[in-house]
């Protein structure tokens, strides 16, 4: 009996050991096979950075700080040229923004060992992120990354870091219960506006500290493909949180209640960048959103001068809907309104436990 017990323990221990070894091998394969699809470009001497007072110029592009304190960026060319110009013009701002972001993470995770584990987890989680970001935007991010510091290479290469940072808004969803994300927006048109024109308003509440919000950037893009557009963000951010293109199409995003994502997909700001650059109508915006899988839930308020109205694209990792208004106004906070999502358990929980319905009611009063 004693011998049988010893054999049982021995074989069980061997089995557990082999299972652990197989798991370690599997995780190692995932980790070392992670591919962010780093572009292969050789920088060219396209020009010289010229700086006078508050104006910086490089290869026909410029960055200046206006009297309001906002930074204004104008870039043109192909994707890599745009990214390279952004990097050359704003290298100090890129460093400041990244330092503030990493310092904020260090406050939350002060242990270097935990930070190393966090990096390991992010590599595993976002191992296929490159596949979910269109090549044009990867090229632009790569151009920017050439001017980024190597001080934080323990997190990843400059390109890998900049690509991952574009998930910052999405990662905020995981902290939504802590009120890092809570936006409000509205649109009104027809008899509800003084001159019958389409009016869009929004409040962007994504808080990562006062230092993170110190350098606000208004970017004016003249891409070789698609429409010219303007967007508001921060240095290094090529995704769109709020913006308008030359056809009069506007985009604003509002977080919705999400389950914790289990795998990487397209960051929501990259999806809305694609919409802003390539859509002129609500239907075109919807078609672009339909072809991309996102890993968080979001409401995207689309205003269209050509359509003369606005609508909300409600999107989750599993499904999508277009919510329209029967009247001349539409309101968007942080819960879904369409028949597709209205009765979902997560949406009902969000309505019951967040301030989203109260902000919605306040916008109705205004």
Regions found by a protein language model. Give the residues of each.
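Gly/Pro-rich turn-and-neighbor structural signature
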Residues: 144-201
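N-terminal type II signal-anchor transmembrane helix
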Residues: 5-38
């Amino acid at each position: 009996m004693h011998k049988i017990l010893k054999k049982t323990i021995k074989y069980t221990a061997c089995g557990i050991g082999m299972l652990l070894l197989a798991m370690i091998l599997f995780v190692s394969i995932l980790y070392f096979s992670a591919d962010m699809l780093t572009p292969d470009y050789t920088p060219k001497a396209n020009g010289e950075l010229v700086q006078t007072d508050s104006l910086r110029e490089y290869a026909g592009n410029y960055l200046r700080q206006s009297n309001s304190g906002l930074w204004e960026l104008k870039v043109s060319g192909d994707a890599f040229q745009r990214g390279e110009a952004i990097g050359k013009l704003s290298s100090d701002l890129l460093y400041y923004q990244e330092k503030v972001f990493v310092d904020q993470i260090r406050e939350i995770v002060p242990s270097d060992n935990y930070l190393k584990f966090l990096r390991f987890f992010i590599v595993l989680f976002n191992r296929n992120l490159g596949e979910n970001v269109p090549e044009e935007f990867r090229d632009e991010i790569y151009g920017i990354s050439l001017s980024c510091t190597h001080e934080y290479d323990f997190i990843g290469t400059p390109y890998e870091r900049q690509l991952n940072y574009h998930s910052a808004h999405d990662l905020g969803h995981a902290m939504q219960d802590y009120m890092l994300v809570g936006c409000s927006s509205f649109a009104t048109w027809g008899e509800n506006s003084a001159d019958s024109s389409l009016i869009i308003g929004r409040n962007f509440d994504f808080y990562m500290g006062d230092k993170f919000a110190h350098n606000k950037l208004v970017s004016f893009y003249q891409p070789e493909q698609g429409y010219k557009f303007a967007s508001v963000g921060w240095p290094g951010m090529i995704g769109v949180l709020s913006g308008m293109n030359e056809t009069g199409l506007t985009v604003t995003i509002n977080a919705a209640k999400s389950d914790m994502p289990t795998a990487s997909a397209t960051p929501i700001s990259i999806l809305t960048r694609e919409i802003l650059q390539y859509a002129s109508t609500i239907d075109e915006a919807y078609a672009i959103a339909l072809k991309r899988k996102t890993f968080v839930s979001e409401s995207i308020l689309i205003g269209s001068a050509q359509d003369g109205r606005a609508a909300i694209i409600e999107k989750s990792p599993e499904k999508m809907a277009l919510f329209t208004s029967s009247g001349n106004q539409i309101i968007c906070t942080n819960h879904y309104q369409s028949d597709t999502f209205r009765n979902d358990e997560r949406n009902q929980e969000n309505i019951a436990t967040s301030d989203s319905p109260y902000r919605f009611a306040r916008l109705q009063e205004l």
